[in-house]
Swiss-Prot record:
GO molecular function: 6,7-dimethyl-8-ribityllumazine synthase activity
Keywords for the protein's UniProt record, in alphabetical order: Riboflavin biosynthesis, Transferase
GO biological process assignments: riboflavin biosynthetic process
EC nos: 2.5.1.78
Name of the gene: ribH
Name of this protein: 6,7-dimethyl-8-ribityllumazine synthase
Length: 156
């Protein structure tokens, strides 16, 4: 039986991080976690990391699509936070963001790591951005690196 698994050390990986400005006080922590994981655990060089800011989570799929189409990156990490409010806006933004990012990954055959928090409250978002529940930005970055290696192994 053949088993394909990836490792997270990828010193030559070229990684883009697309991040939403909306809810920046939470997203900044996601970004810090992602960059730290890429550099410290993944051993990715600073010059191989590109950060692209967009207005909100809804705009992430378009930016990630452009990054994928550029062929300049081995993976893209999408970071943002969508917090439920009193209207249906949450469902629309979270759903379109998630399905849009998934569609880009499948179309471009490029790892697109989902680091977009979809929470019921600000407190839950803060917990997932580096306090009680770890840092989902770091987790997404490591997922991207592992998927780079998995796809390389599949193609080998």
């Amino acid at each position: 039986m053949n088993v394909i698994e990836g490792v997270v050390a990828a010193p030559d990986a070229r990684v883009a991080i697309a991040i939403a400005r909306f809810n920046h006080f939470i997203n900044d922590s996601l970004l810090n976690g992602a960059v730290d994981a890429l550099k410290r655990i993944g051993q990715v060089k600073d010059e191989n990391i590109t950060v692209v800011w967009v207005p909100g989570a809804y705009e992430l799929p378009l930016a990630v699509s452009a990054l994928a189409d550029s062929k300049n990156y081995d993976a893209v990490v999408a970071l943002g936070t969508v917090i439920r409010g009193g209207t249906a806006h949450f469902e629309f933004v979270a759903g379109e963001c998630s399905s849009g990012l998934s569609a880009v990954a499948a179309r471009a055959a490029l790892p697109v790591a989902f680091g977009v928090l979809t929470t019921e409250s600000i407190e839950q978002a803060i917990e997932r951005a580096g306090t009680k529940a770890g840092n989902k930005g770091a987790e997404a970055a490591l997922t991207a690196l592992e998927m780079i290696k998995v796809l390389q192994a599949i193609k080998a």
